[in-house]
Each structure stands twice: as C-alpha cells, then as structure tokens.
Amino acid sequence: MNQGKLEVVKQEMARVNVDILGISELKGTAMGEFNSDDHYIYYCGQESLRRNGVAIMVNKRVQNAVLGCNLKNDRMISFHLQGKPFNITVIQVYAPTSNAEEAEDEWFYEELQDLLELTPKKDVLFIIGDWNAKVGSQETPGVTGKFGLGMWREAGQRLI
C-alpha cells in the first residue's frame, strides 16, 4: 500500500470511528507488519505475483490488546485480541472468484478450516472480507436477510 493510500485509509478509519479494518486485494508481494503513526498493519501477499493479498489494520488502542497474528497466506490472515469477558479472533479473507479452478476453491476452504481449528473455542469469532459470493435476495432465517443482491451463485451457496 503506497503512502498516499495509507494516509487516506487512516483518515477514513478515524472519521467513521473504525478500530479494526480488513483489507482485500492488497496486491503486495510480501508478508509482515509495520506501524504508521498510531496505526498498525499486518499484511500477507503472494511471494512473486502482485495479486490477491490481505491485511488487517488497527488503531493504537486495539494494538495494545493484540495477543498474536497468523500471516497464513495471500488469501487469509487471523488476528487474536485480548477481550473481556472473552478473547476475540478476527479472520480476514479474500475468497477465489467464481471462475477459479475447483482446486483453488478447495484449497481456500481447507486453509480456512485450519485457521478455525486453531481458534480457541471460547473466543468470539469474526470472519470478515471479500467472499466473492452472491447469496441472492432469498431469505435464509438466521443467516441472510431478504435484501441480498441478484441471484445466488454456487460460491454463495457454499458460504451459507
């Protein structure tokens, strides 16, 4: 993420009072973490190609509660926070598009399952990001409302 874009994101996080921000399609070629003023960024991209990539960006207040971060791969990253009465795990994902090979879809969900198995059972869990899925406007009680977009796709059905 270039410095100009980073400054805009930090300003918007402050303006709308967002403490934790998930980013998809970062398109970086490395993994790691860095701080910029009062924000911390944990990111993971592909080693050679500038595609995919995920990041989690937090403000200083949230950073003080960080217990750890798992830079899994260019499609998912997890973040563990100390909370009360329960700790919190946030997983940021960037799912394959509908035209991806079946093997890539399978790999994505296997990797996600691995992250879920590493999540302590008592944690509050948030999975955020771009699922590249349409769930349609058909209501699924307890899962989706009736205000979805378009017709559901196979990726949407798998997500539900």
Question: Would you name each region that the model predicts?
Answer:
Residues 1-160:
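A shared catalytic/ligand-binding motif for oxyanion handling
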